[in-house]
């Protein structure tokens, strides 16, 4: 499956025709902050600016959710994903769910 260029936030892929829509593919990751990470981030907030510990945690969670979405689309028989989106929800104090989802499709080169 999924060449990176065949995953898009748009609902079509230039140069390709969508032959079949297979349904929603999603990847979900639930992460919590460690005590050490929370302490380190608290120190960073004293100085303002980007909190790199949280940025790194968020980026890892998004990447993991993205890869899980690709795996699910592959299991569904898709070779592309359209309408890809991210969502994040704090489900408990310090615990965040990151969801990456889109429509798994079978796409072929147009022409």
Curated annotation (Swiss-Prot):
Which InterPro entries did the record assign? UPF0145_dom_sf, UPF0145_YbjQ-like
Which Pfam family, just one, is annotated for this protein?
YbjQ_1
Similarity-based family: Belongs to the UPF0145 family.
- Protein known as: UPF0145 protein BMA0904
Q: Which organism is it from?
A: Burkholderia mallei (strain ATCC 23344)
């Amino acid at each position: 499956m999924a060449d990176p260029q065949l995953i898009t936030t748009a609902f079509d892929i230039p140069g390709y025709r969508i032959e079949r829509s297979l349904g929603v593919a999603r990847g979900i990751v639930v992460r919590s902050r460690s005590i050490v990470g929370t302490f380190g981030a608290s120190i960073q907030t004293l100085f303002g600016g980007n909190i790199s510990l949280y940025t790194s945690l968020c980026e890892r969670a998004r990447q993991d959710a993205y890869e899980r979405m690709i795996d699910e689309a592959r299991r569904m028989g898709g070779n592309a994903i359209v309408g890809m989106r991210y969502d994040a929800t704090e489900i408990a104090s310090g615990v965040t769910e990151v969801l990456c989802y889109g429509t798994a499709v079978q796409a072929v080169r147009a022409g």
